[in-house]
Amino acid sequence: MAAAAGEEEEEEEAARESAARPAAGPALWRLPEELLLLICSYLDMRALGRLAQVCRWLRRFTSCDLLWRRIARASLNSGFTRLGTDLMTSVPVKERVKVSQNWRLGRCREGILLKWRCSQMPWMQLEDDSLYISQANFILAYQFRPDGASLNRRPLGVFAGHDEDVCHFVLANSHIVSAGGDGKIGIHKIHSTFTVKYSAHEQEVNCVDCKGGIIVSGSRDRTAKVWPLASGRLGQCLHTIQTEDRVWSIAISPLLSSFVTGTACCGHFSPLRIWDLNSGQLMTHLGSDFPPGAGVLDVMYESPFTLLSCGYDTYVRYWDLRTSVRKCVMEWEEPHDSTLYCLQTDGNHLLATGSSYYGVVRLWDRRQRACLHAFPLTSTPLSSPVYCLRLTTKHLYAALSYNLHVLDFQNP
């Protein structure tokens, strides 16, 4: 008992040990904190880590977000955008940089979150601590457990209404806007049982996007359409655009003034075209000299003037509308000549792509052309495309034909 009491006293004394600036030691530590911050801002990650081992005060001092922000902005998937906006202010920057090294080195733990018996073409979205995923003609909502690498098995909600498979869906204004193989668009309120569907196209609706109360859809019937989200005007088409090609992907500009379509590149020479959202008129087309069949399967805006695209021609292309609409700024080629089904970005340096064979997920550092890491998620007998990718600063989620996979970079 006496020994135990002595140990407790030692622990309490250690806990009470002052984290204040040491009175003795080099004169450097007696400088004003502002000057110390300036000096330490020139240190790299390794030097800051070693300095933190000197004493408790320096460990606290070198954990300051200000010292790690510059390092984080140059790191992969640390929660900072290209313009320096911090998307995760509640998480210490030092902790994010630590996890970022696992992304850079490809250190992760693979797991399977969901399985299904029949082959699917799932799509998914993340929102806060919830995951929404399509299975056949349903959309299911699951809640993540605190570790982010597992799900509560019982769905939070099930959203139905389509007669055929859900091809695509987005989350907008507490609504789920879904595109179905039955040619219909579905509107589901997330926190109620309200569901409306209406006939939108003559054939399956392959893609949909919704921003600012406006819905855009693209279909196999070679049209793109613009719709209002307002409850009193659901199903009233604002514009019908003849694209001369099957529309595989679609995205609204953050400025809400235009939208881009990614088409099959069979009936029209350009698979990427930008349309005026208010008039439905063609504004411009991107690129030139695309080979027939170079369809764009995924397209996304990173900013009002920059966007990324990928598809059948095995390239990811980065476009900047301020420089040129005929030539992309940067491109990355899938090294095994596989179709690229989907892409995701951290808004800064990290790019993730999903390939058509063996469930291969690739990570790219956009500052270099070569692939950084590749993760084959299926073996030869069960080869599957990666239909959809989503990522956070700690995890990457990949939806395949039979499974939903997670790559955990926080606890590799």
Swiss-Prot record:
Keywords: Developmental protein, Repeat, Ubl conjugation pathway, WD repeat, Wnt signaling pathway. Expressed in brain, kidney, lung and liver. CDD domains: F-box_FBXW4 (cd20090). PROSITE patterns: FBOX, WD_REPEATS_2, WD_REPEATS_REGION. It comes from the Eukaryota. Part of a SCF (SKP1-cullin-F-box) protein ligase complex. Interacts with POUF51. This is F-box/WD repeat-containing protein 4.
